[in-house]
Amino acid sequence: MRCPNCNSLDTQVKDSRPTEDSSVIRRRRVCIACNFRFTTFERVQLRELIVIKRNGRRVPFDRDKLMRSVQISLRKRPVDPERVEQMVSAIVRELESGGEAEISSETIGESVMDHLRKLDDVAYVRFASVYRNFREAKDFEAVLGELSHEDEARAALVRK
């Protein structure tokens, strides 16, 4: 592992431990050349995914880009970062285990929206507004109407 401080390849692992859901290994490292300490995270990659963009271009799947877009939708929301990490890991696992090496950006977007809907309504609406390219207030009203209808249906089930 290359040191982010001095670019030396001579680093040493001082501590390794799994995260809470055991999907990632956290490693504390130290650079032998400059004594800089840093942390790395390792996760299993089941397959190399290719994303088919709306314009037809094919690009490598970028987990960090997915995480950034989810974090933007969750900005200033009271959601534990560990739950966000678990959600993104679950989305990636679903995509990797889907059997296809190439997946559409629409498939990814729909998966993110499904997971965000369960995690935080505000983040779901924020993500949907960008993903579905909302242009007018009625676009927001339609999504909010869907959410309130789902809430009413859930409440009716609880009362039974």
UniProtKB/Swiss-Prot annotation:
Residues 49-139 form the ATP-cone domain. Pfam families: ATP-cone (PF03477), Zn_ribbon_NrdR (PF22811). PROSITE patterns: ATP_CONE (PS51161). Keywords: ATP-binding, DNA-binding, Metal-binding, Nucleotide-binding, Repressor, Transcription, Transcription regulation, Zinc, Zinc-finger. InterPro entries: ATP-cone_dom, NrdR-like_N, RNR_NrdR-like. Residues 1-20 are annotated as: Disordered. GO terms for biological process: negative regulation of DNA-templated transcription. GO terms for molecular function: ATP binding; DNA binding; zinc ion binding. The keyword Repressor applies. Its cofactor is Zn(2+). Residues 1-11 have a biased composition (Polar residues). A zinc finger (unnamed) spans 3-34. Binds 1 zinc ion. Belongs to the NrdR family. Negatively regulates transcription of bacterial ribonucleotide reductase nrd genes and operons by binding to NrdR-boxes. NCBIfam families: transcriptional regulator NrdR. This is Transcriptional repressor NrdR. The gene is nrdR.
